[in-house]
Swiss-Prot record:
Active site, UniProt feature: 95, 353
Gene3D superfamilies referenced in this protein's UniProt entry, alphabetically: 1.10.150.530, Aldolase class I
Protein role: Specifically methylates position 2 of adenine 2503 in 23S rRNA and position 2 of adenine 37 in tRNAs. m2A2503 modification seems to play a crucial role in the proofreading step occurring at the peptidyl transferase center and thus would serve to optimize ribosomal fidelity.
A GO biological process held by the record: tRNA methylation
Cofactor(s) recorded in Swiss-Prot or TrEMBL: [4Fe-4S] cluster
E.C. code: 2.1.1.192
Enzyme class: transferase
Compartment(s) where it occurs, according to its Swiss-Prot or TrEMBL record: Cytoplasm
Protein's UniProt name: Dual-specificity RNA methyltransferase RlmN
Amino acid sequence: MEAVERVNLLGLDGAALSELVGQWGGKPFRARQLQRWVHQRGADSFDAMTDLARDFRAQLARDCVIEALPVNTEQRSSDGTRKWLFDVGQGNAIETVFIPEDDRGTLCISSQAGCVVNCRFCSTGHQGFNRNLRASEIIGQLWWAKRVLEAAADTARLPGGKAGEDTRVISNVVMMGMGEPLLNYDQVLPALRLMLDDNAYGLSRRRVTVSTSGVVPMMDRLSQDCPVALAVSLHAPNDALRDELVPLNKKYPLNALLAACERYLAHAPRDFITFEYCMLDGINDTDQHARELIQLARQVRCKLNLIPFNPFPASGLKRSPSARVRVFAQRLMDAGIVTTVRKTRGDDIDAACGQLAGEVRDRTRITERNATRTIPIQQVHA
């Protein structure tokens, strides 16, 4: 007789969990109790759920699991940034990075192992695409990090404990790790709903950000299903250049993308879209590009986030000099465009989208020795 795969409760949003419990004759409040045990208390054992009936716990133990991805490595930077490398099988791995700041703690999570969008400046795309992550694997990154960080914070508060950033816990989540979230929509959506659910993580929509390269139809769906804060990987002020840097632009050009952004704003928790713009020396950082970008930005309520590029050999690209970035940013601000320059965090542990995952692929796939480095995950202003 073939064994039935047990349900991983990490991947079930409130509606799905209520349906499962209802199939066993349970009431909706039992599902809410169970959800709080899993996501708020971080329980990984049904025996620990002492306010649930013994028979119910036995049913859960037979049919369900609470299981995050295995952790290959964990690293910590001198600035407090922490990075986990999760094993997704077949020699592939994804990264999750926690960035503590004075006023927030931001967790950057992945939605795919690899990426199909293949932006020219991103090493993750050069590595290719392995598979979509399941909802349990997406939310499992948050579940794991929350447990680790809260345990560290509890320890730091003890007499003689270490104060400071050790007490910072997760207040914001950004989907800016590996992958294009909107190309894994059916798994990303329940993960987002769990992040917002008061019986799970209870984050406000303003504190959860999805970053997309511009999958227009799915932007429209997200605006209806779960309108969290939105960041768009722009990186070019015109179609000709964006076609080269972000190949998806050939399918969804800027006029369609900007129209989708405007539609999204009707439902968004913030009154602006964040445009991400990776600064590439001599490619998209000239005064003319700044003028074009100003005209584009005036079409949509937005803010610009300029990102210094971290070169990798396969890209053939260079980082814009710091002086050029400052001049570029000043031109935008002088035109009334809210502009920030992302600050690098976690340099000493290579806290980078896909970077260490690429190294894992190198070690396990001899034919992919040309997989190289990537753009660091840096300070995120969600």
